[in-house]
Each structure stands twice: as structure tokens, then as C-alpha cells.
A protein has these predicted regions:
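Metal-ion/cofactor- or nucleotide/acyl-coenzyme-handling active-site neighborhoods
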Residues: 1-250
Length: 250
């Protein structure tokens, strides 16, 4: 409802979404301008939210621009092509793309030497921003020139897991890792939230982005009673810029 109200008040706003929100937006008659896809896993597998990825793209609006990262699994890209999606490619930056001799070293002059075997053209723009598509969307929009971004649905938490879900674990057992609970609790502003390791990584990305001075005045957050909403409140409380309200009220 808040998103619909915002679009009504700002009819020229462009909605950029991630795959998990895409079907619900269409169901509620909100047609996204774009959907960012960053998924190196097969479309037949289950997503981080235990949804078969193919089901998320059961319906595709021909007007949606799908921004598909080059690291995306070919099965996802082929499914979108077969269903007539409008696709734009992009490269997501990770340190693993760099030449082996440069990996782990500080980047100089915002330029990196890539592994030539990857086939990424020299001078290509690489999108930074975080561990998931939602966070990369901020970097992508900023690269495109957008300077007024409103964040909806950034939560990074979930309802309390069921007894069955509480038995789920994560970890590469075959690789010698000790299995860990999939669902964990974290405390933000004296409030407990249920989350997962991947969602917690996104929350940490949010914390970094909210404190990035180059994004000052560009981001606006919409939402409450979520982990990220509390992180945004912390950001506002730490804000040190002078307030001239009293001056202008005189």
C-alpha cells in the first residue's frame, strides 16, 4: 500500500525490484520498470527463501527490463529469453574477477586488471554494492545517474521459524564444515530478529551503505518494525550534520 501511494504521488518514479518481489508486484498491479537478477545457481533449485526460482518468473511482463548479471546461471538467462523477456547485461564486481596477482590488493585509481580468460572487455563498468541483488541495485542506479532512491521492502528478517525449519542447517558438510543452524537470532536496538546468514550479510551491507557519505541525501528509507528499519534509525541518530530548523523558524 505504501509503495502504491508513493507511485501515485510520484507517477514518473521507476520501480526496480528483485526476483522475490517481482511476482507479488505484478499480482498487485504494480509493473516494475526493471528487475535485477544476480543468481549463479540453476533456475530449478530453491532460492534463499525456499522458493523454486523458476516459479518466481512464471509470469513475465514484456515491459520489464531484466538486468541480468554475467555471472547468472545460463538456465536462468535462457528461461528469460524463452519467455520473451527484455534483457540487459551487466557485470557484478567481485575480487575473484581480478587477475590472480592482484587479488586481495587495494584497488588503485578505481581501476582493476581483470582475468583475461573471463572475456570481459577492457574498460567495462563493474557494479559494486554488496552480497545480493537488492544491494547491487543501489550501485547500478547510482551508476545510471539516479540521485533520488527510495528503499521499500528492505527488511533482512523473517517470522519465527517453525519447528521443522528449526532443524534446517547450512554448511558444506562434504567439505568438512560443521553444520550450523540456518535460522539465527540477532539483536538490534534491544529488539530480537530472526534471520539467516545471507540476510544478515545483506543487513551488514545496509549498515555500510547507510553510512556512505557519497550517498548522503540520495537514499530514503520506507518501512518500520524490521531489522533494517532499526539500522536506518541508528544512522539517523548518528547523523552529525547541523540542523538549521531554529534559524529558519525565526
Amino acid at each position: 500500500k505504501k509503495l502504491k501511494d508513493f507511485i501515485k504521488k510520484n507517477p514518473t518514479a521507476r520501480v526496480l525490484t528483485v526476483k522475490h518481489a517481482y511476482p507479488n508486484l505484478l499480482k498487485n498491479n504494480i509493473k516494475p520498470w526493471g528487475c535485477i537478477v544476480l543468481d549463479p545457481r540453476a533456475i530449478t533449485g530453491k532460492s534463499t527463501h525456499n522458493i523454486v526460482r523458476k516459479d518466481l518468473f512464471a509470469t513475465i511482463d514484456p515491459q520489464t527490463n531484466f538486468f541480468v548479471a554475467s555471472m547468472t546461471d545460463p538456465s536462468v538467462t535462457n528461461h528469460l529469453i524463452d519467455n520473451g523477456a527484455r534483457i540487459w547485461g551487466w557485470h557484478a564486481y567481485t575480487d575473484s574477477l581480478r587477475d590472480e596477482d592482484e587479488q586481495g590488493h587495494v584497488i588503485q585509481n578505481q581501476q582493476v586488471k581483470l582475468n583475461e580468460d573471463l572475456g570481459i572487455p577492457k574498460g567495462a563498468t563493474l557494479i559494486t554494492g554488496g552480497t545480493c541483488a537488492a544491494m547491487r541495485s543501489i550501485g547500478m542506479l547510482h551508476t545510471m545517474g539516479f540521485r533520488d532512491m527510495h528503499l521499500f521492502g528492505f527488511d533482512c528478517c523473517r517470522e519465527e521459524p517453525t519447528k521443522e525449519e528449526m532443524t534446517e542447517t547450512v554448511g558444506d558438510i562434504d567439505g568438512g564444515e560443521t553444520p550450523k543452524p540456518k535460522y539465527i537470532q540477532v539483536n538490534v536496538k534491544d529488539k530480537m530478529y530472526w534471520t539467516t546468514g545471507e540476510l544478515l550479510a545483506m543487513a551488514q551491507d545496509c549498515e555500510k551503505v547507510f553510512g556512505d557519505p557519497t550517498l548522503d541525501g540520495i537514499l530514503s528509507f520506507h518501512g518500520e518494525d524490521t531489522m533494517v528499519a532499526d539500522l536506518w534509525k541508528i544512522k539517523e541518530q548518528l547523523e552529525t550534520r547541523p540542523i538549521f530548523r531554529d534559524y529558519y523558524d525565526k
